[in-house]
Amino acid sequence: IDNEEIPILDGSAIKFVNPLVKAGICKQNSPLDLCSVKKTIEVKNKNGWVKFEPSSDLKLTVEIDYPNTCIGKQKFSLKVTKDTFQRELCDNRTFCLKKDIEDMRERGYALGGSLDNAIVVDGFTIKNPNGLRRKDEFVRHKMLDALGDLALSGLPLLGHYISFCGGHRLNNQLLIKLFSDKSNYENVMAGNDNPHKFVNKNFTSSDQNYSAAI
């Protein structure tokens, strides 16, 4: 990636997922390390909050609220597996409010955005001629966003992620808080399907520092 944004393609993850699925999985003789959340932790701002609760699986519950638009309030929960990710999440497109487009472009973002790769909402109207892929595509895309943010931990997580009007910055702060105290989590081994090296040394109290994995 040579810029601040990855190629938008169709605005969802499906055009990244399909080639990976087609390529298949190569089994390796290395254990799969997981991070299990052991305590409830939360971060918030004036607009929303995100938190982790202990769980034996990875589960996400996301709620959004866009008053005075056709988005409105939406809530979606999902136990994340390979199958549910492909079936329920990966094809949900990004979206924006029409009134925000000019501001984003002035800041150098969404320069390639169009009705072919984003849902544009103008009040109670969806500007895309073909409409939505699902009636709750908005909240599902927010869950897709969150799952991508959580992947920056560097290894699969076991826990229940819950969000109310959260976003990328809050998700980053939640990961920072999770790894700031070793009593918040436990590293466990799950098998030998895919090797993951867990790296958390780069987590700091600053929300400008992001996690890394090798």
Question: Where are the predicted features?
Answer:
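C-terminal regulatory domains involved in ligand/effector binding and gene-expression control
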Residues: 1-214
